[in-house]
Amino acid sequence: MNKLRKLKRDTDHRQALMRNLATSLFKHGRIMTTEAKAKDLRRIAEKLITIAKKGDLASYRRVLGYLYEEDVAYDLFQKIAPRYQGRNGGYTRIIKVGPRKGDGAMMVYIELV
């Protein structure tokens, strides 16, 4: 099984971070974050969209258990997933912005295609 990066956080903190980032991505459609976080988020977001494409109750409950906001999960099933019915993956895009001023970390936009 492939692992995600540790991102210098313990397991619970890292999982909460990814849940927050995924919720924000589906809520806003585009977010700015570091490159490492975006690469991990891409894997999670694409899996959630693939699950949502099934559209059944079990899939809805599975996604609802991952995302923090119920209305975001509803939008994922009603608005976002139907856009990708003819596409097999590649639902997100990462665009490099440049280094962050404070510490030089590479900042990127991750957005839904």
From Swiss-Prot:
Disulphide-bonded residues: none
Instruction: Give the protein's recorded name.
Output: Large ribosomal subunit protein bL17
Question: What GO biological process, any one, is recorded here?
Answer: translation
What InterPro entries does the entry give? Ribosomal_bL17, Ribosomal_bL17_CS, Ribosomal_bL17_sf
**Top-level taxon in the UniProt lineage:** Bacteria
Its keywords, alphabetically, are: Ribonucleoprotein, Ribosomal protein
Q: Assembly and partners?
A: Part of the 50S ribosomal subunit. Contacts protein L32.
Q: Which Pfam families match?
A: Ribosomal_L17
Per the record's keyword annotation, is Ribosomal protein included, yes or no?
A: yes
The entry assigns this protein to a family as follows: Belongs to the bacterial ribosomal protein bL17 family.
A cellular component term (GO) from this record?
cytosolic large ribosomal subunit
* GO MF annotations in UniProt: structural constituent of ribosome
Q: Which organism is it from?
A: Caldicellulosiruptor bescii (strain ATCC BAA-1888 / DSM 6725 / KCTC 15123 / Z-1320)
